[in-house]
Amino acid sequence: MPKGIIGKKIGMTRVFKDGKAIPVTVIQVEPNYVVNIRTEDKDGYSAVVLGTGEKKEKRTPKPMLAIFKKAGLKPLRHLAEFPLKEGEQPEPGQEVKVEDVFEKGDLVDVTGTSKGRGFASAMKRWDFSGFKKSHGSRYHRAVGSIGACSDPGRVWKTKRMAGHYGNETITVQGLEVVDIIPEKNIILVKGSVPGAPKSVVKLKESVIIHRRKGKRKLERAKAVYAS
């Protein structure tokens, strides 16, 4: 089975456990289908390509249309590639459900596109403190100095200034799976994830479980949901 799955962010709510309120993000996992399999012999690595969401056939490129037809699937809108777990390998055209990939207490990394905020000031974009609000200050929300005078005589690249903010791919690591509702294809993840409601997100096995702190966090989470 793959180490990840494609879902859709619904919104945030909270659940109660032992009298404590836990903020969670509700993610709906629509039917995911295996589109293609990457193999060591052909591609040099092992992975699986999952797809979800309907797409019109006339809007699908012919090379992709051939891949879908080979797997016995209709064109799918969203595709993502995930590494494979050890054990049973999926077949092209097979449906992958959320309970096949994750269980309570797992740690996941969630990738999504952050909300676009348009042209934003340096204070909003980079969390600058700004100038004094009173006592004769000539500036309040200005950037301030953006470089030296004659040397180098220009503004350095990557200088933090006003500009386009948001609409970026962001990954939040080490979020805990609080609950899975198979009959509704819903997974509850502790904390917030990037993106607006109804935006597509990718959930995959967290990379921090291979670190010392991540292993301890995973052990604590598993112990909580085992009790």
From Swiss-Prot:
Keywords: Ribonucleoprotein, Ribosomal protein, RNA-binding, rRNA-binding. InterPro entries: Ribosomal_uL3, Ribosomal_uL3_bac/org-type, Transl_B-barrel_sf. The keyword Cell wall biogenesis/degradation does not apply. It comes from the Bacteria. SUPFAM superfamilies: Translation proteins (SSF50447). The keyword RNA-binding applies. GO terms for molecular function: rRNA binding; structural constituent of ribosome. Pfam families: Ribosomal_L3. GO terms for biological process: translation. GO terms for cellular component: cytosolic large ribosomal subunit. Part of the 50S ribosomal subunit. Forms a cluster with proteins L14 and L19. NCBIfam families: L3_bact (TIGR03625). HAMAP family: Ribosomal_uL3_B. Belongs to the universal ribosomal protein uL3 family. One of the primary rRNA binding proteins, it binds directly near the 3'-end of the 23S rRNA, where it nucleates assembly of the 50S subunit. PANTHER family: 50S RIBOSOMAL PROTEIN L3 (PTHR11229), LARGE RIBOSOMAL SUBUNIT PROTEIN UL3C (PTHR11229:SF16). This is Large ribosomal subunit protein uL3. It comes from Persephonella marina (strain DSM 14350 / EX-H1).
